[in-house]
């Protein structure tokens, strides 16, 4: 019997708060909100690259975020910070932190709290597919918000910065780059505006507050995101996820997630695909949890979970 896990679950059942989970090498800080209602599974909200779990707690313009919205719907909500992000300890070798190492820490959290819905965004997408294959008993469903697909779907790019720089822009990759892994990657405000805060739905008056929330990123993670040298996070067989409820949600103003790309990811994984304009929801970019209709999209996700009996 896993006495440590049972003790953790008993402690978590008492009150909202925070705790640390993850692996010994890569601990993660986790916020916990809400209390479970009968029959409703907990949900784990995982941020993407350059962000922390704070993007789910409040919006840049100060409104309640997705975490409280899901808590109000009657679920326990767990919001981790990736290793080296936010309040999770940063190791000296942070620049070489890999997708697999982050995924292993998230997997440990899921093992501690029991089966849960895993909601992922952007660069945490490949981690979700990997975790679901490695530890299927811990993942009851996956919601991917503009998620990265498994590296199985990406071309293998050369492990050479000059060669990568000569490649044409690929809509499935954005503008590929190969970065040196000797220091963390600092994301410039120009990139944030062009790719994360570009939509008409983003609260532009709060851009400076959003900019201050962005954190340095692992250089290795960036190289894996572009599948440099074929080192992106892959799954063994999409059939291993065939019985898992998966929802992929994408907006029409996300420059790095055009409809064709995320629809292809959904087909490969056997997922349901929601192109928001087909639901009468237009103008969303890469950060719908921050945008002015964030509550509307959270409600769409809640409705899908309830329709699935999760």
Positions of the model-derived regions?
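N-terminal cap/lid segment of alpha/beta-hydrolase-fold proteins
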Residues: 2-37
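Conserved alpha/beta-hydrolase
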Residues: 61-90
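Active-site glycine-rich loops that stabilize anionic/oxyanionic intermediates
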Residues: 47-60, 122-123, 252-253
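Catalytic histidine-centered segment of alpha/beta-hydrolase-like enzymes
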Residues: 279-294
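Conserved hydrolase catalytic core segment
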Residues: 115-156
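Alpha/beta-hydrolase
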Residues: 159-261, 271-275
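Conserved acidic catalytic loop of the alpha/beta-hydrolase fold
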Residues: 100-117
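Glycine-rich "HGGG/HGxG" loop immediately N-terminal to the catalytic nucleophile
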Residues: 54, 80-96, 282-283
